[in-house]
Amino acid sequence: MRTYPLRRFLLALVALSAFSCLSLAAKERWIEQRDPQFGYNYSYPEALFASVADDGKPGFHYLAANASDAKFLVGAWDNRDGATPEHFKRWMIENAGGYEEITYQPRGRSWFVLSGYRGDQIYYEKVMFSCGERVVNILAIAYPVAERDQFDPVVERMEDRFSTGEC
């Protein structure tokens, strides 16, 4: 049987690197928040993000990374136009701009994700409809491609903990 010590070493190095990034995300102190108006829940690592001035829209929260060009937005609004998840996704792609390089777009009955590249940034946007599609909730984050190893596990955890409020 032929062995490949260099291949094993590289495989072990990749596994160790991935584990280190995941454990860093797990060790950080996470802030858990609930929006008072719409009741959605979100979380973020305290060491990575800090609140920044917002535009005064109720139900929205803006954060920026302390030592990076990463940005994080979470918000919700009343779906007065009665948009469906598919209609709103189509509207975002056709009107909001920056969706030329979509690499990931899973969807469910009441939610969808758009993720991809905008220049040197990776974006991840999850939209969830709640309360019989009366409320639209969004989590959006963008971060430098060069910092993917640091942010990918963080985004995974943020996405897992993002939830809609009760109706």
List PLM regions with ranges.
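N-terminal "mature-domain start" segment
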Residues: 26-56
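Conserved polar/disulfide-associated segments of primarily extracytoplasmic proteins
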Residues: 53-153
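Solvent-exposed, polar/charged alpha-helical surfaces in well-ordered, non-transmembrane soluble domains
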Residues: 42, 46, 86, 90, ...
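Short, solvent-exposed mixed-charge patches
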Residues: 165-167
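Bacterial N-terminal signal peptides that target proteins for export
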Residues: 2-11
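Bacterial N-terminal signal peptides
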Residues: 11-20
